[in-house]
């Protein structure tokens, strides 16, 4: 089982949204997934509850409470026994022994960020913290920045400047663009199953097209992430 961790010091950086999106992309490819909910607010647990009500949750995916060390250890042990392909961890903001343990146990680390000065500053701080932690533990774990909520059209001058600041860091080649489909995942459930349900409703054709474009974007990102995980 490979562990993919989403981490950022900043709340609202897009960790949970990125995890939900990649979860849908991996699941659509037949992967079995364990989700470690290490945020004390348990956003993944609420996501599953919403999805079950909408019939947009798959049996190939399970959410584990992991906001305490004992819960994390139990979750990891059970997920290994269940034979999941990937575990996706949603950390809480800031640094802690729990976050450090998750980071040090990972096969790949993703640091989501939006292209604003505050977000980029927090992403750089998170990246420095992660690298220093890995060096102190004599670990070499691939770490990359995932750009979030990038405009579909042209970037502003400020956004281009923020993007340029990331040039010296490993960055996932394809970003997640700003799309209603991504913003609505928390309420609608797994994107690929939401899309599947809409395909049977001719009145939802325009929305279905938007969801399909969003899903294609996630599949592209998931392939890049899978290559790094399996590499």
From Swiss-Prot:
Keywords assigned by UniProt, alphabetized: Crown gall tumor, Plasmid
Chaperone listed as a keyword: no
MF-aspect GO terms: DNA binding
SUPFAM superfamilies: P-loop containing nucleoside triphosphate hydrolases
Entry-linked InterPro entries: DNA_Partitioning_ATPase, P-loop_NTPase, VirC1
CDD domains, alphabetized: ParAB_family
Domain of life: Bacteria
One Pfam family from the record: VirC1
NCBIfam families assigned to the protein according to its UniProt record, in alphabetical order: PRK13849.1
Misc. remarks from the entry: The Ti plasmid contains at least six transcriptional units, designated vir loci, which are essential for efficient crown-gall tumorigenesis.
Name of the protein this chain belongs to: Protein virC1
């Amino acid at each position: 089982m490979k562990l993919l961790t989403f981490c950022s010091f900043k709340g609202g950086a897009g960790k949970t949204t990125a995890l939900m999106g990649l979860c849908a992309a991996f699941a659509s490819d037949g992967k079995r997934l364990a989700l470690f909910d290490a945020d004390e607010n348990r956003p993944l647990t609420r996501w599953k509850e919403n999805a079950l009500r909408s019939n947009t949750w798959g049996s190939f995916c399970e959410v584990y409470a992991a906001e305490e060390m004992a819960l994390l250890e139990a979750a990891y042990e059970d997920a290994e026994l269940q034979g999941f392909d990937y575990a996706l961890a949603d950390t809480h903001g800031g640094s802690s022994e729990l976050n450090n343990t998750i980071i040090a146990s990972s096969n790949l680390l993703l640091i989501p960020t939006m292209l604003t000065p505050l977000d980029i500053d927090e992403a750089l701080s998170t990246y420095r913290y992660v690298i220093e932690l890995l060096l102190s533990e004599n670990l070499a774990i691939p770490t990359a920045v995932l750009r979030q909520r990038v405009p579909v059209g042209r970037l502003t001058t400020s956004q281009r400047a923020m993007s340029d600041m990331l040039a010296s860091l490993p960055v996932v080649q394809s970003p997640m663009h700003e799309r209603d489909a991504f913003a609505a995942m928390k309420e609608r459930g797994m994107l690929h199953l939401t899309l599947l349900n809409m395909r049977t409703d001719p009145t939802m054709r325009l929305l279905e097209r938007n969801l399909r474009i969003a899903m294609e974007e996630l599949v592209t990102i998931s392939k890049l992430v899978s290559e790094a995980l399996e590499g």
